[in-house]
């Protein structure tokens, strides 16, 4: 799935020279690193990866003071690809977009997710999807990654 996402990113962006991958903490970061690695293998250039802490920008968690986000040099000419493990309501993505916007004005922002499980509360649609996995509201998708959990696995758990 990640190899296909990497090829789709290359095709849509005519290469990967002006890309920045922004992994949503926690599991989006290793996914972004894996995609960057695949892009580097294909294109001979590995785009940079940053980690996004979206906690202060969430509207569904207790209010936290939003940190001063560092300006990212060259962001103005870049396409930022936000990478996350699971897309559900869209609230994490909205927070990630706000976090990226605080770092500067990207040329474009795109979204890559490993799993799209539906049930959106916001009008957000990913540009790149590893797997569409329709679920019931009372189910939860758990993504386990080698880097964070010691194994690669996706499971659906009833709540």
Show which residues each predicted segment covers.
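PRPP-associated nucleotide enzymes
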Residues: 1-159
């Amino acid at each position: 799935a990640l190899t296909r996402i990497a090829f789709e990113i290359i095709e849509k962006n005519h290469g990967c020279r002006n890309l920045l991958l922004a992994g949503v903490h926690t599991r989006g970061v290793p996914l972004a690193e894996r995609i960057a690695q695949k892009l580097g293998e294909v294109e001979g250039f590995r785009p940079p990866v940053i980690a996004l802490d979206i906690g202060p920008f969430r509207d569904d968690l207790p209010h936290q003071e939003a940190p001063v986000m560092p300006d990212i040099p060259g962001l103005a000419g870049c396409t930022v690809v936000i990478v996350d493990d699971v897309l559900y309501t869209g609230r994490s993505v909205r927070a990630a977009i706000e976090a990226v916007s605080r770092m500067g004005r990207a040329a474009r922002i795109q979204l890559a997710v490993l799993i799209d499980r539906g049930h959106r509360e916001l009008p957000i649609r990913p540009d790149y999807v590893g797997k569409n996995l329709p679920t019931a509201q009372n189910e939860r998708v758990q993504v386990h990654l080698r880097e964070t959990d010691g194994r690669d696995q996706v499971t659906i758990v009833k709540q």
